[in-house]
């Protein structure tokens, strides 16, 4: 406990050392103004309807070539921000994405980019929660089968990009 307190005091000394040096050069100048009472970090936004949160819509890319879209989706499947979906979606994309038609690719794009919460995708794919009708597509069925892992493939890391 004492060690942690001493470490905290040392760290705070390092943080405030530049401020102390600048203040020692300003002996006759007025003190700095106090910090603003409210910054954007501490503003609490409370909506009347807690189920509704205004989220920006994902931009539709109608003129994107199919190969470019598949490359973008492969990247987005690997970089989800949560390890569970990184592993599930990257292995799914490596297995199926190159064989998708334009319509299937659009469905996959809508699935991974239309949902605002990645945990929803995870819960739907693992069948913890029911899938909403707009996302219950052929692609979601393939993803659910992929998650069941009937082949018993070990998925401890993402597949290589050049494989």
UniProtKB/Swiss-Prot annotation:
Any Pfam family matching the protein: Sdh5
Main location group: mitochondrion
Subcellular location: Mitochondrion matrix
Keyword Chaperone: yes
UniProt signal peptide: none
Keywords for the protein's UniProt record, in alphabetical order: Chaperone, Mitochondrion, Transit peptide
Gene Ontology cellular component terms for the protein in this record: mitochondrial matrix; mitochondrion
Transit peptide: 1-23
Function: Plays an essential role in the assembly of succinate dehydrogenase (SDH), an enzyme complex (also referred to as respiratory complex II) that is a component of both the tricarboxylic acid (TCA) cycle and the mitochondrial electron transport chain, and which couples the oxidation of succinate to fumarate with the reduction of ubiquinone (coenzyme Q) to ubiquinol. Required for flavinylation (covalent attachment of FAD) of the flavoprotein subunit of the SDH catalytic dimer.
Protein family: Belongs to the SDHAF2 family.
Name this polypeptide is given: Succinate dehydrogenase assembly factor 2-A, mitochondrial
Species the sequence originates in: Drosophila sechellia
The organism's taxonomic lineage, starting at the top: Eukaryota, Metazoa, Ecdysozoa, Arthropoda, Hexapoda
């Amino acid at each position: 406990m004492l060690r942690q307190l001493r470490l905290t005091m040392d760290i705070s000394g390092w943080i405030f050392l530049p401020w102390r040096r600048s203040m020692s050069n300003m002996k006759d100048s007025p003190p700095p103004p106090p910090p603003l009472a409210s910054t954007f970090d501490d503003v609490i936004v409370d909506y009347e309807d807690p189920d509704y949160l205004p989220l920006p819509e994902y931009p539709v890319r109608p003129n994107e070539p199919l190969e470019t879209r598949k490359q973008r989706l492969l990247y987005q499947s690997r970089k989800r921000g949560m390890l569970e979906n990184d592993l599930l979606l990257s292995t799914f994309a490596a297995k199926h994405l190159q064989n998708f038609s334009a319509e299937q690719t659009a469905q996959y794009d809508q699935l991974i980019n239309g949902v605002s919460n990645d945990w929803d995708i995870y819960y739907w794919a693992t069948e913890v929660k029911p899938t909403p009708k707009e996302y219950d597509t052929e692609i979601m069925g393939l993803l659910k089968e992929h998650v069941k892992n009937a082949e018993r493939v070990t998925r401890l890391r993402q597949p290589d990009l050049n494989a």
